[in-house]
Amino acid sequence: MRTKSLKKNKINVITLGCSKNVYDSEVLMGQLKASGKNVVHEEEGNIVVINTCGFIDNAKAESVNTILEYADKKERGLVDKVFVTGCLSERYRPDLEKEIPNVDQYFGTTELPALLKALGADYRHELLGERLTTTPKNYAYLKISEGCDRPCSFCAIPLMRGKNVSQTIEKLVKEAEGLAKNGVKELILIAQDLTYYGLDLYKKRALGELLEALVKIEGIEWIRLHYAFPTGFPMDVLEIMKREPKICNYIDIPLQHISDSILKSMKRGTTREKTTKLLKDFRAAVPGMAIRTTLIVGYPGETEEDFEILKEFVQEMKFDRMGCFAYSHEENTGAYELVDDVPDEVKQARSLEIMDLQSQISWDLNQEKLGQTFRCIIDRKEGGHFVGRTEFDSPDVDNEVLIDATKHYVKTGEFVNIKIIEATEFDLYGEPA
């Protein structure tokens, strides 16, 4: 099929996976727009770019299925060109080129200039950070570094994203100022490891210095921290969080496990005792802080005793938010040399058991919020409700606050004080205070 003239080309960028991919797609779309390209919503484009995830089996399957779907559409003349980028392409490019050759070209995670060239656009270094945001207008992700230097045995991210590379404080402040001018009120700081930020550039952990600079930006009212690592956490961050009202009393710190034998095999560089002390220090330094974590069950060699230790820890710590995943045996990782000896059905059962525990904890914690009033940001209107969040909740993964739109009006993108009148495990219901 003949490709349409450049003026008529419409480029559809499909994003799969995590918030880092969302950010990368926004950068790509910003560059395309700056080159005069027509970036459109899904199903409207005749040129498709798929930004893939290659982290675990389920994510890889979703990415492969999406590539197959659009390769088939190209075969049937429904789209003209298909390009693939992101982590799956970085990790498995030779295999993908062999198995799905109908894709026009595959690109890795560091090949933005080449991808833009293939799309007929110019790469403009001075525009880095100027994105076409896809999130609601009131919040945006700010990726402060790329890659990871940690040796975690189960994780394939360093294979796909490389070593840690921090962005300068000056660049990040400039990017955040641009977002604020466009109406962004909440910055969600993301990285593979926030706590490592600055070690490559400044030879020290500089997350605290970055936060001190970001809180000065006019228009930014919330700054949220995602993906901290429990080893080497810069404790000055807690002092800043307590002092600065713009820093949300919230942290996402994936712990993965707590049994010492599993932590050692995972090469996490910590112990149950050290982790427990760290979390207690968090709560002592910032009373009321919401702690989100992620756990992995079914790691090679995980015994019933290890799992019981993990359950006890969950019950003891009463995390505010949690996700739990069944271990995925990833090639070219350290753990791939181990025997994947926990049956899939046991992995799934353990994951469900952990989440059942967390559901009860979440229910209890949310019941305590009844009658309280919280400052909420209103993200959107959906169905019969306005949907917002407290400072203790991140988009997509945490609690939402639902306000009955048939009884009350609140403005999306704005902060509103909401009194909680009803609560379930994962949602709060409220009315303007």
Curated annotation (Swiss-Prot):
A GO biological-process term: tRNA modification
Function: Catalyzes the methylthiolation of an aspartic acid residue of ribosomal protein uS12.
Keyword match Glycosyltransferase: no
Residues noted as binding [4Fe-4S] cluster 1 in the record, renumbered to the chain: C18, C53, C87
Enzyme class, broadest EC rank: transferase
Alphabetically ordered keywords of this record: 4Fe-4S, Cytoplasm, Iron, Iron-sulfur, Metal-binding, S-adenosyl-L-methionine, Transferase
Name this protein carries in UniProt: Ribosomal protein uS12 methylthiotransferase RimO
Known catalytic reactions: L-aspartate(89)-[ribosomal protein uS12]-hydrogen + (sulfur carrier)-SH + AH2 + 2 S-adenosyl-L-methionine = 3-methylsulfanyl-L-aspartate(89)-[ribosomal protein uS12]-hydrogen + (sulfur carrier)-H + 5'-deoxyadenosine + L-methionine + A + S-adenosyl-L-homocysteine + 2 H(+)
SS bond list: none
UniProt domain MTTase N-terminal: residue ranges: 9-124
Binding, [4Fe-4S] cluster 2: C148, C152, C155
UniProt domain Radical SAM core: residue ranges: 134-364
Family, similarity comment: Belongs to the methylthiotransferase family. RimO subfamily.
Listed PROSITE patterns: MTTASE_N, MTTASE_RADICAL, RADICAL_SAM, TRAM
Protein EC: 2.8.4.4
Cofactor(s) required, per the database record: [4Fe-4S] cluster
Compartment(s): Cytoplasm
Span of domain TRAM: 367-433
GO CC aspect terms: cytosol
Cited Pfam families: Radical_SAM, TRAM_2, UPF0004
Gene Ontology molecular function, alphabetical: 4 iron, 4 sulfur cluster binding; aspartic acid methylthiotransferase activity; metal ion binding; protein methylthiotransferase activity
Organism of derivation: Flavobacterium psychrophilum (strain ATCC 49511 / DSM 21280 / CIP 103535 / JIP02/86)
Cofactor binding remark: Binds 2 [4Fe-4S] clusters. One cluster is coordinated with 3 cysteines and an exchangeable S-adenosyl-L-methionine.
